[in-house]
Amino acid sequence: MAPYLQHFIAWFGKDSILSKLIQIFNPPSHSDSAKIIISDDDGRSPEPPGGEEILWRHSAPKSTQMWAFLQKVNKKYGYSLRTYQDLHHWSITHRGQFWGEAWDYCGIRHSRQYDEVVDEAAAMWPRPAWFRGARLNFAENLLFPKVPQAVSDEAIAVISVDEGGKRDFITWQDLRERVRRCQSGMRALKIQPSDRVAGYVANHSNALVAMLATASLGAIWTAVSPDTGVIGAVDRLVQIEPRLLFTDNAVIYNGRIHPVLTKTQEIITALPSLEAVVVMRTVAGVQEDLPSSPRSPAKRLTYNSFLAQGPETQKLEFVHMPAEHPLYILYSSGTTGPPKCIVHGAIGTLMQHKKEHMLQSDIQPGDRLCFVTTCMWMMWHWLVSGLASGATVVLYNGSPFYYAPSSHGTSAKDDLAMPKLVDELGITQFGASATYFSMLERRKHLPRSLTQGRLSLETLKAVYSTGSPLAPSTFRYIYQAFGSQVNLGSISGGTDIIADFGVPSPLQAVVAGEIQVIALGMAVQAWGPTGMDLSVTGEPGELVQFWGPSGASKYESSYFAKYPGVWAHGDHIQINPRTGGLIMLGRSDGTLNPKGVRFGSAEIYHVLQYHFAAQVEDALCVGRRRRQDTDEMVVLFVKMRQDQLWSLALAEAIRRTVREELSPRHVPELIIECPEIPVTANGKKVEVLVKRIVSGVEVPAAGGSGTVNADCLQWFQEWATQN
């Protein structure tokens, strides 16, 4: 629909006779992702007409970086963009202009300027080239951020905190020196561009330094959290063939020390490509030496001996590579087999994160950004990219419910640990999973109240939540608990894009239950099963590179097979046509997502096959989330072998083994014996349908499910009714 017609609708109201005639004869096209709304004099959108509950508006939107960017675009191109919707519409209909302006405004350090941003005529698939001809280094952009207010060498770049009370304040100068020494150690091991360097590490400063040193050489970084079991780690790392592995000696979580090196020893014997293993002394007083083994010739080094390999005179250098050179490998959930290895390039990661930090979130140099995450989750990569915007990055390693006031204090269980850390360190932007905030809400914690925490939280400008949908009641709770001044950014994206589709905006109101806006440069719509755009109706719909020899075909089949030429992300969403906000309804496939942690059923099946094949004939693992549930529950249905009996002892053994081999996050909440596992004609387990049945979403119809043993679906229906 033409912009002037959208203006008419805004002026006269969408329910007026004239507006209805315009909408009938001018239906929106796929490029019309948001209608134009006339702003007030302060740059803010007006009150939505549908009676939505507004919880926050920016007090001075014209002081933000997004407003400055909008004015820069207006001046350069002679536009009169006034609202976020105007800016977003321009960003997706003039993508070359938008990303070129974002490159300039956000500040990308490079040794060669791009020849072309992107071919405007190119479709999403086959994947077009971006910023062709440019050469840069990702680590250089984080260590020497190109921002209007230059950071001081003596300013704090990183604050690393652990559950035991340790505080490590690292200046920009010190961070660069630490990366230099780590890079020198890698050079001694002859690490080259495109080599893979892996971390079996927690969220601490040495992990960040190792990543930056890896990226500085043009090598590729990947990480697996040390709470992941041996099978889970090997399933991922064996595919990428790392040359170098960093590992923690131990981690502290929930008040306990968890040694890591026993698992590390098993992992390295399964990685024939490995040439060296470096042990980081993350927990003092715990084994640090990794004994040699004839099963793996990889060199064993402590972190200090690794650093000592490189000459002290070696300068910090940055290997400049093509803009899309691989930077990170992350992993899919493993729903249909071994987790897929998802490759992310330097410029895509850097541009998306700087856009989201500077424009969408208004993060400024000197702000202090903290997100509770592991190194394996994409939010760690999002967090550490805050350095590129000149922010101080706060790394927290441990349970968010343990707190020690200082390095001399005693760690104790404390539900208000993170709010206390906000006050102690002056954190300005704090983020965690939606489950974390809903847990605080259920426990009725009010950290600023006189009867509880007596905290001020006065430095806090924004709160971010992601991982699963945030309930409207939790929106209200966050404003009650953390203060009316915060921009609540309920954000949504994915490991697949290492970025966000739904983001904050300082030019838009926060509405209870809604993600504020669709991100700039992202043409997001909600499509129905037939490919019809449901965005303007408000109906639910679907939110529309892998490593290895079959990466391109996996990429296409995973994201472009459902709607040819259009990315199908697999999220079930609504778009509010009045506000432009997104409402997340959950996953639209069978991926398990308890407490915001995504993983696949295949990982559970692997453990059962390896450890319980003598007792369990088959199994089905699904997520259950009924209308009244605030989170997804993982349910494991098992079919016993004919001569075997089900018992509670077996269920406990399965839980214990899953916890050890994969992680505590993988442990099913319920393990139930069932008479039969539904399968299709080609033997595929019917997970998605069973998930819908046990969640109360769909009653199985006879003959319509594609299940060869469809009669057994009735058992799942009866179980769901009774439980």
Curated annotation (Swiss-Prot):
Superkingdom field: Eukaryota
CDD domains in the record: AACS
EC number: 6.2.1.-
Keywords from the UniProt entry: ATP-binding, Ligase, Nucleotide-binding
Residue intervals passing through the bilayer: none
Gene Ontology MF terms: acetoacetate-CoA ligase activity; ATP binding
Pathway per the UniProt entry: Secondary metabolite biosynthesis; terpenoid biosynthesis
Keyword ATP-binding: yes
Use in biotechnology or industry: Viridicatumtoxin and its derivative, viridicatumtoxin B, exhibit anti-methicillin-resistant Staphylococcus aureus (anti-MRSA) activity. Moreover, viridicatumtoxin and a C2 acetyl analog, spirohexaline, have been demonstrated to inhibit bacterial undecaprenyl diphosphate synthase, a potential new target for antibiotic development.
UniProt key word Nucleotide-binding: yes
BP term (GO), one: viridicatumtoxin biosynthetic process
PROSITE patterns found in the cross-reference section: AMP_BINDING (PS00455)
EC category name: ligase
Function description: Malonamoyl-CoA synthetase; part of the gene cluster that mediates the biosynthesis of viridicatumtoxin, a tetracycline-like fungal meroterpenoid with a unique, fused spirobicyclic ring system. The first step of the pathway is the production of the malonamoyl-CoA starter unit for the polyketide synthase vrtA. The aldolase vrtJ may be involved in the synthesis of the malonamate substrate for malonamoyl-CoA synthetase vrtB. The polyketide synthase vrtA then may utilize the malonamoyl-CoA starter unit, followed by sequential condensation of eight malonyl-CoA units to form the polyketide backbone.
Similarity comment text for this entry: Belongs to the ATP-dependent AMP-binding enzyme family.
PANTHER family, per the entry: ACETOACETYL-COA SYNTHETASE
Protein's recorded name: Malonamoyl-CoA synthetase vrtB
